Amino acid sequence: TATTEIYTLSLHDALPICAMEKQSKKDLNIMYKRILVPTDGTPMSEKAVEGAARFAKSLGASLVLITVVEPYSYTNLSEYRPESIEQYDERVTAEAKDRLADAKRRCDEIGVPSTTLMVKSFSPAEAIIEQSKKHDCDVVFMASHGRQGFAAVLLGSETQKVLTHSQIPVMVYR
């Protein structure tokens, strides 16, 4: 039977935990070369980006920073919309680019190579999982909750979905 060991990762002022089959740090260095890190601009996801960057630096890994923006919703068309589709797209794209630029800057300051992705999807969890496969990521490193905050007691709903459906390890930053 495989044994499981809990690794505590000292990443500055927080204590994220990862459960996995027993591995040595050398094995972790081999296992994790590309880490997908979702960010939605919330303080928790910003801390997760910094934690992921410190973790990646200790392993010599790189980060793939992703933000998922919701496409314009055509539901409730009778509802008053203060902005056009084009205005909405421009606004959410600008916000996403700013969010990714901030995350990349933090990675650069820590000295970790990173690339950025902006994806449009009504399902952030599905987009995260799809992009982790597309970019050959070894692990997803994400905040325990984001914009939904208290939608779930312990974990955000998107984090729960990624944990449930991802075929690669998921590290949850708390």
Q: What is the predicted role of each segment?
A:
Residues T1-L15:
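Short, small-residue-biased leader/transition segments that mark boundaries at the very start
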Residues E21, K26-P82, R106-T115:
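Small/aliphatic-rich secondary-structure junction motif
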Residues S84-D98:
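A short acidic, glycine-rich active-site loop
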Residues M118-A127:
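Charged docking surfaces used in two-component/phosphorelay signaling
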Residues Q131-C137:
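Glycine-rich phosphate-binding loop signature in dinucleotide/nucleotide-binding domains
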Residues V139-T164:
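Glycine-rich, Arg-bearing micro-motifs that act as flexible, cationic patches
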Residues I168-Y173:
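Short, flexible loop segments at boundaries between secondary-structure elements
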